[in-house]
C-alpha cells in the first residue's frame, strides 16, 4: 500500500513540474508576442534625414519604457568646427526645459517645509521684491509663479559669456521688470522672469547658489553627471550651439538673466534618469528626490493655457488628449537649441529629444510621435487615424468704448514717459510718445484684451538697439486702460502703462 502511494506521489510531482514548465514557456512566448523588440528604424530614418537635408548638426534621442532605456543614441556632430561627434553623454542647452528642473527643486523645498506653495513669493526673496501699480502682490504666490498665473508677463534677456559684466544678478531684472501686470490667479501669461524669480527663491531659502543647490540636491542624487547650470567655456563634452539660418552658423555663447527659466545643460542619458523619476520608476544609478504625491501634484494642478486640451501644471505642459493619452511635456526652443521631454505616464513611457540648433516644433513632434508609435501600438493606431481639423479663428469686435483718445504714462526704471493712444473706427490708429511723431499702429486685435504693435524707442539703456517693435497688451477697466508694453529689441522687456480716456478727439 505504501509502495503505490509513493509511486502516485512521484507521478503527481512529475505532472505538476511538466505543467508549470509548459505554462512558464507559454507565458514567456505570450510576453514576446505582446512586447516584441521595438523597431526604431523609422525614427532613426527621420533623424538622419534632418541631418542630411536640413543640415542639423546633431540630434540625440532616448526612449524609456517601464524603467528601461529602449533607445539611446546620438547622431551628428556636437562641434562642427572640431569634428567632435555627439554622444549620449553630450550636454545640450535645454532652454525652457530648465523650468521643469527648477519646479522640481521648488517641490523638494516644499517637502522639506522650507517653502509653502501658497505663500507670497516676496516672503522668500531677501534683497528684492516683486511690485505692482494695481494688484495685491501677496497674491503672487509660489504656485502661481510655477503655473504662470502670478501676473508677471513676457521677459527675456541674455548676455555674452565673454563679456566682463556677464552674467549679471537677477536682482536688477526683478527690480526693474518684476511687475505684477495682471490680477494674480486670473490670467495665464508665460513668464521667464517668473521662473527666474523661483531660481532666486531657491537660492535665498537654501542659502546656496542656485547652481550649487541643483548640483547637490537634484543632479548628484539622481546620478545626472553631465548636467549643470549655465554655459561653461571650460566644459569639454558640451554641444556647441548653431543658429537656425541656412548655413547653421556658430552661435555665440550666451547666458540668461533668468537662470531658473532657461540655463540648464543636460544629456539624453541624464534626462532619461529625470524622466524615470517622474514616471515613478527606479532611477538608474540614482535615488528618489521628491515623493509620488509631489509628482502627481505637479501634473494635476492645472490651469488652462487657452487651447483645447492644453493646460499648464507646475513646471510641465499637459495635453489631456494627446492621441488618446495624457501627455506631460517639458520643452525648450531657441534659434540655436531644441530640447523635448515628453512622457505618457499611464503607459510608463518617455521620449527625450535634444538638438544643438533650432528645429521647427512640427519636425520634433514627428520624430517623437514615431518613437512613441514604436512602443505603443494604440498610440500608433490613434496617430494613423487622426484627422487634423482646422479650428476656426474666432474674431472679436472692438468695443465702442475703446474708440477715442487715451492719455497716460509708461513707467520705466529711468523715468515716466507720456503716451497718447488714438483709436478710431476708420482705422486712423496711432501712438504718440512724449511730444514726438505719431507712430502708426499695426496688427490691432481684440481678444479679451487689446493687442497691437508700433515701431519706436522708449530710450532706455536695456533695449540696447533702436528702433524696435513694441507690443501692447492692454486691459480696460471702465475709463482706464492698463497693461504691458514689451520692447522687442535685443531683449524682451516689459513696462507698465496706464491711461485714462479723455474727451479730446
Walk through the language-model features, giving the residues of each.
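Short, well-ordered beta-strand elements
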Residues: 340-343, 347-357, 484
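Active-site SXXK
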Residues: 44-47, 61, 67, 91-121, ...
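Short, glycine/proline-biased beta-turn/loop segments that scaffold the active-site neighborhood
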Residues: 117-133, 222
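Short, gly/Ser/Thr-rich active-site loops of penicillin-recognizing serine hydrolases
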Residues: 355-420, 487-505
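Central antiparallel beta-sheet cores of small beta-barrel/beta-sandwich binding domains
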Residues: 408-471
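Short, conserved catalytic-motif segment at the N-terminal edge
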Residues: 35-92, 114-116, 130, 167, ...
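Bacterial Sec-dependent N-terminal signal peptides
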Residues: 1-34
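Short, surface-exposed loop or secondary-structure junction motifs
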Residues: 79, 133-335, 339-340
